[in-house]
């Protein structure tokens, strides 16, 4: 699934879907979710639709799409997440709603003291030591408690037991949130956690190997690439341990000119391997954005991504 844009970053068509039986040869299956011509629609032409992700719900037999939505004419102020459903992965997906997650719900890793507002909360200057301390202590969680938490760059993850999670950049892009979805994957249960408060992570991509969860993220440099970050945890809600930059070798400082978007598990009868999928943005011509795919391996408990000019997928293993 990908964002169909023109030269700018606004949605003009919707979310396009491609299919493949071998991960080499791909078919353009058309538009899975169309923007609306109704100017009053939340997904009208000219809104911002980013990071679409689709998961399948075994119980309802629905394909569920979540995405980052910004309302037309509001820049990136809305910070909402939208949801749509379809009986087919090809669509058409029916748009249901958008909102900010977990209104009226405190994170599970938030103390009683953190819930108390301070008289100085609205007077702090950004990037000062006082602001940084307040941010880590939940400044924006408290601010957005009633209306719901901000949700921008996002991904989805379905665990072994069928539980699904919505992982998104929140708190003015300063902190990641991991939020549990309802059994039908169409809403939030209210159980959520703050991850790496004040860590300035976006573009989350998450996967699980054995009983360990791994996550790769990006720093905040707009459309420009930066060194990736990696983390691991034994519980989806953390605590998450920082592992450093998973990219190794030349151009690792810009993650091979990419930003994380998804980690694709490749499953065989005997093993599972993983492919790092990264976006190569072109801010001067957004429709010309590209992907890079590289093998991802776990070495000494840490994910590693190395550049290869060419590589082959053999079952669930990789060959140069």
Q: What does each model-identified segment do?
A:
Residues 1-320:
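Carbohydrate-active catalytic/glycan-binding domains of CAZyme proteins
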